Amino acid sequence: AKVKNARSKDLADIFNNTASSKMSLDDILEFSYEIAIGNEKISLEEFNKLVEGSNGLIKYKNKYVLIDKEESKKIFEQIAKANFKSLSRMELIHASMSGQLDQYDFDYDAAFAKIIQDFTKPVDVNPPETLKGELRPYQMTGLKWLWTNVSKGFGACMADDMGLGKTIQVISLILKMKEEGLLTKPVLVICPTTLMGNWMKELQMFAPSVDAVIYHGTERKLDVKHDVILTTYAIMRIDVEELKKQTWGMIIVDEAQNIKNPDTAQTLAIKMLKSDIKIAMTGTPVENRLTELWSIFDFINQGYLGSLREFQKSYAIPIERFKENSRAAKLKMSISPFVLRRLKTDKHVISDLPEKMVLNEYCYLSKSQAVLYEKTLNEMMDKISGFTGINRRGNIFKLITALKQICNHPYQFLKS
């Protein structure tokens, strides 16, 4: 069966400029199925009659054609069920990148071809003039990768190894978009509380021209008249009703493994926020299950990997349960344009990084701690020796906890 594109709506200007590409990712592309034997197109009815009246060998216009009857029935049922189909541009790109279209003789028209061609074409960009610092070559590559995705209306997952400078690459993107006049609304950065100070420090160091504020604390008040607003996951979850009223110029989620569970209140809240551009930063896009990857993609490029149920059926179950390498390869291929993962141990990425130095620093117990530690250990070991089974295991765990508390501070164990 030959699948030919019949028509597409208003595709001539796809990706011609940043604004139109951002607004067009969910536009609908339309196509229809057609059947051909050789180069001769035939109707559905004629095809069905030929298949029904054959035992695998059919005669068509003085030619004999060998055909798989069962496969032909499947083709007929598929076409009869949905002779006219539609895809969003996001779905078309996923189908193309994952190889789903390879099973068909898919006849693209010029507009369809342009979508795929422009999508795979990198966009060059110069470093921002207002950046106070110099990007390493691999960081410049990261900026170009971010710029390519953002300029075509896609989100991205920056998954570089810790220490390669994910933050400065994303800050460079903010500066470049600001210089190009593409940021007319504030950028919202959501990160763990422990990283908020580091974000502010790096913004002040590398991007002093950016007006950044912290939205945190009991006296917080949302003021969107700033370039960048920094907040935490906890505050975002508490104030989601306020934050979702805004349409943000860009939303950046640092330590994105915090949204790996698709059903948690935190993840659901963050996906309520509105922005055309969403960036996830994480050194561990997948920690335990593939659905964690789906959850991050549902944030950066909603719909690209289908619904959660579709993803589980197409990828998670075949890969995790049945170890299907072909599915894993398809998934890797389909997500590769949107995930940048580089390791600092890779000399092709960075060759002048010194070897990791491990320095052991020992913290010694005070005299009172040492006495209490030994006394507690001896007393509880004598007690444990008289126990068996679950009682013994429970008391061993209790001893470990007690010794940890003493090492931290005797007060934590003594409670006085």
What are these model-predicted stretches?
Residues 1-114:
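Accessory nucleic-acid engagement/destabilization modules that flank
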Residues 328:
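Long, charge-dense, solvent-exposed interaction surfaces that engage phosphate-rich ligands
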Residues 105-323, 332-353, 357-416:
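ASCE P-loop NTPase motor core, strongest for the SF2 helicase catalytic module
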